[in-house]
Each structure stands twice: as structure tokens, then as C-alpha cells.
């Protein structure tokens, strides 16, 4: 029933949604015609998004609220979909890998510049492939299967983006089902559907991380519905597309079912079968991953902000990289045990455990690429934790600034990002403590 309160809510969201669409269009236009710069577009969109989140969490809603949310989400995606990718060139490798497979060649066998693949070179895809002169593909088997499937429909960037956006958009529908199953308002899907990270890193850049999101959401939904085999299938699919979702396993394996090996067997079997499909290249089925670890400083420790901060900010110059690895491993192991022991404490508790594991993993990893944080967004729709809402939104904006350049600038970016997130977390804790123990007047 439409009331004055819900009319205010819907009017506010309609205006905010329209502004989000306009800013998507302006961001696309900034590629060719500088007006205010993409960084300003990103900042404005991030601020409007946070206002929209506040509205949907604190204002009354009706059936039209959900319609407005979905329509605006679709409109934003369509604006970004039909524009060329400009924040990343990864999608050109996706199309290339699909074409290589269509030619009957294992995509892990040759680098794009290899003479064996000269017959596949063209002017639309090949010149734009990053690391084409020295890097094998890094994308896991699940991603490779998607690349092959989509390029059989159309071997173009637009078709690849359409495939990724189509899969990502399924996440909205799945999240609505999950919200309803948990007794939460379906309008909270706005937290996911309107997030600028999704709009620009999936709808605009077409990152394959977006294709993992519906399977992560499905794993959560099947867990809530007490379907362990289906949970395992969805988790395995997400893992084969992007490796990190496997970290959710301890939270999604019910302690009461520890004698039931179906779920872990399904996960292990599907992941093994996926890699076996490309095993004709032997250990090279890992692709560029080992070299990538060196290139990104994963082996030396230069990649990890918390380690760098300990060495330079806290002046623990002699702290070895191995100590950070041990600390990270023990912390994640402890969280895994905690999640497993709490798997029978309720569906929301298990989801919260998974969210904590995913968050801690990403904070330890301190990715140099914003799309790696995409998998946190489905959790935020279920658990709107303010510090991580701030973190993911600020992350989106800061990566559009000059602070995102590798080197000292990026260190200062992380120092600002982690520091302000810590302040937001402390303020939330203080507010909660004050609410529980108000001062006597």
C-alpha cells in the first residue's frame, strides 16, 4: 500500500537511481570527452550509492520500491555494457582463450605470441591482450569453459561482456531468494545491485569474477535450504571460475553432517574433474599463476600492505615474510575451525562466518585490483556491515585516482583505506556500546 512514507522512499530511490544511471553514462563519456574526469564521477556515484543504501535500510518500503531498484540496476548495466572496456583489458584475453579452445588447442599450452597461434591473430583482439608476449593464461578451468561457450555465440568483446553481465545479473535474482529465505527484506538487494564495483568491473570491464558471484550466492542459498550436495556443486563451480571461494568451505559444511562426505566429495570431485579436462599440459595447467605470484610480489611479501606497514609504519624492519605467512595461515585456520564449530548455530551465523573469512582473506591479501573484492558484495546484502560497506565503496573510488599507481602511491592509498576503515569500525563499536549502556541523565 502506497503511503506518504513509502512515497518519500520511492521518490528518493528513483532520483538516486536516475542519478546513478546518468553518472554511468557520464563515466562512459569521460573516455572520449573529458568533462569532470572519471575520478569525480566515481566519487559522486560512491556517495549516491551510500545514500541509497541508507534509504533502503532505514525507510519503509512497498512493492514499488523493489521495482525501482531492479529497473535502475538493469539500466546502469545496459549503459556500461554497450561501451568499450577502458578500466581493464583482461576481457581481450577471455575472447582469445575461447578462440584458442575453439581451434582445438589447450589454452594453457601456448602464450598468445607463440607462432603456433599466429593463424588466430586479428586486429580486434590480439593487439589488446596484456602480457601476450610472455604469459600463459592464468584463468582456471571453469573460466575457460565459460570463455569457450560464450565465444561460440560470438567471439567479440561485446558478446563476452554480455555473457558476464548475464551471469552476474542472475546474482540479483538469487540474492532476492536468499534474502526472503532468511526473512530479510528483498529490497536489501540494492546493496549488491547498485554497488559501483559491480557496475564498472563487471558491466563495463566484463571481469570473469562476476561469473563466480551467482555460484557463490547459490552456494549460500542451497546451504540455507539444507541441500549439501547442491551447495557443494555451486561452491565447486565458483572455485573453478575464481579460486578463492573455496575459503567458504568451512562455513558451508555443517558440523552435524561431518560423517556425510557427499558435500566435500562433490567439491573435490568437480574441481579435480575441471582441472583434469585441461591436464594434457601437465603442471602447466596452473598457467601463469606461479609467475603471477612473483610478478605481483606475493612470494617476496611486497604485495601485502599489512606486512609493509609493519616493516615501515611500525619499524619492524627485520620482520620476515615467512612470519606474515605463518600469521596469516594460523589466523585463517583459526577462523576455519571457528566457522566449522559454529555451523549449527543458525544459517545467519554460518553466513556471517563465511563473510568474516572472506573479509579477513581479502584484508590480508590487499589486492591491487578492485574487482577482487566483488565476492564480498553478496554478503553485504545479507549483513550490511558499515565498515565493509565503506571499505568496498572507498576502494572503488580510490582505485580511480592516481593513488592506485603501483609503488609508494599505492602504499599511501592502502594506508588511507585501511586506516579510515578502522576508524569507521571503531566508531560503530562505540555507537553500539553507547546504545547498550546509555549515560544516565
Predicted regions and their residues:
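Start-transfer (signal-anchor) and selected internal transmembrane alpha helices
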Residues: 1-79, 180, 346, 350-352, ...
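Intramembrane catalytic core of multi-pass membrane enzymes that act on lipidic substrates
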Residues: 61-163
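Aromatic/glycine/proline-enriched transmembrane-helix motif characteristic
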Residues: 172, 271-275, 293-367
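Transmembrane-helix motifs of polytopic, lipid-linked glycan transferases
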Residues: 48-58, 149, 156-182, 186, ...
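Hydrophobic alpha-helical membrane-interfacial segments at the cytosolic entry of transmembrane helices
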Residues: 69-76, 257-280
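Aromatic-enriched
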Residues: 385-441
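Specific aromatic-rich, kink-prone transmembrane helix
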Residues: 170-174, 200, 211-227, 358
Amino acid at each position: 500500500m502506497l503511503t506518504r512514507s513509502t512515497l518519500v522512499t520511492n521518490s528518493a530511490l528513483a532520483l538516486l537511481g536516475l542519478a546513478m544511471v546518468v553518472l554511468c553514462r557520464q563515466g562512459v563519456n569521460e573516455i572520449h570527452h573529458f568533462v569532470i574526469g572519471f575520478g569525480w564521477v566515481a566519487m559522486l556515484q560512491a556517495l549516491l550509492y551510500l545514500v541509497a543504501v541508507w534509504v533502503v535500510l532505514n525507510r519503509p518500503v512497498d512493492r514499488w520500491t523493489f521495482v525501482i531498484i531492479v529497473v535502475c540496476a538493469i539500466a546502469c548495466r545496459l549503459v556500461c555494457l554497450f561501451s568499450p572496456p577502458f578500466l581493464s583489458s583482461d576481457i581481450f584475453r577471455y575472447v582469445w582463450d575461447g578462440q584458442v579452445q575453439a581451434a582445438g588447442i589447450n589454452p594453457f599450452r601456448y602464450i598468445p605470441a607463440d607462432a603456433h597461434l599466429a593463424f588466430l591473430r586479428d586486429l580486434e583482439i590480439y593487439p589488446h591482450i596484456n602480457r601476450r608476449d610472455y604469459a600463459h593464461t592464468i584463468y582456471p578451468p571453469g573460466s575457460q569453459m565459460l570463455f569457450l561457450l560464450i565465444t561460440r555465440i560470438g567471439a567479440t568483446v561485446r558478446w563476452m561482456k554480455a555473457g558476464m553481465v548475464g551471469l552476474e545479473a542472475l546474482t540479483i535474482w538469487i540474492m532476492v531468494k536468499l534474502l526472503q529465505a532468511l526473512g530479510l527484506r528483498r529490497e536489501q538487494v540494492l546493496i549488491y545491485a547498485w554497488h559501483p564495483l559491480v557496475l564498472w568491473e563487471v558491466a563495463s570491464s566484463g571481469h570473469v569474477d562476476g561469473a563466480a558471484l551467482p555460484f557463490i550466492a547459490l552456494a549460500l542459498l542451497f546451504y540455507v535450504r539444507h541441500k549439501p550436495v547442491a551447495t557443494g556443486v555451486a561452491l565447486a563451480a565458483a572455485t573453478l571460475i575464481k579460486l578463492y571461494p573455496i575459503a567458504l568451505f568451512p562455513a558451508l559444511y555443517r558440523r552435524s553432517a561431518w560423517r556425510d562426505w557427499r558435500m566435500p566429495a562433490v567439491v573435490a570431485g568437480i574441481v579435480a574433474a575441471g582441472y583434469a579436462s585441461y591436464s594434457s599440459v601437465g603442471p602447466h595447467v596452473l598457467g601463469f599463476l606461479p609467475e603471477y605470484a612473483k610478478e605481483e610480489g606475493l612470494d617476496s611479501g611486497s604485495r601485502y600492505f599489512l606486512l609493509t606497514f609493519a616493516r615501515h609504519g611500525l619499524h619492524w624492519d627485520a620482520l620476515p615474510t615467512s612470519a606474515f605467512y605463518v600469521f596469516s595461515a594460523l589466523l585463517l585456520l583459526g577462523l576455519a575451525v571457528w566457522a566449522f564449530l559454529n555451523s549449527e548455530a543458525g544459517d545467519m551465523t554460518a553466513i556471517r562466518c563465511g563473510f568474516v573469512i572472506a573479509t579477513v582473506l581479502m584484508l590480508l591479501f590487499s589486492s591491487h585490483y578492485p574487482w577482487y573484492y566483488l565476492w564480498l558484495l553478496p554478503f553485504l546484502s545479507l549483513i550490511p556491515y558499515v565498515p565493509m560497506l565503506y571499505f568496498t565503496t572507498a576502494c572503488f573510488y580510490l582505485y580511480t585516482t592516481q593513488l592506485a599507481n603501483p609503488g609508494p602511491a599505492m602504499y599511501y592509498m592502502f594506508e588511507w583505506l585501511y586506516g579510515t576503515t578502522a576508524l569507521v569500525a571503531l566508531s560503530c563499536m562505540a555507537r553500539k556500546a553507547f546504545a547498550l549502556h546509555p549515560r544516565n541523565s
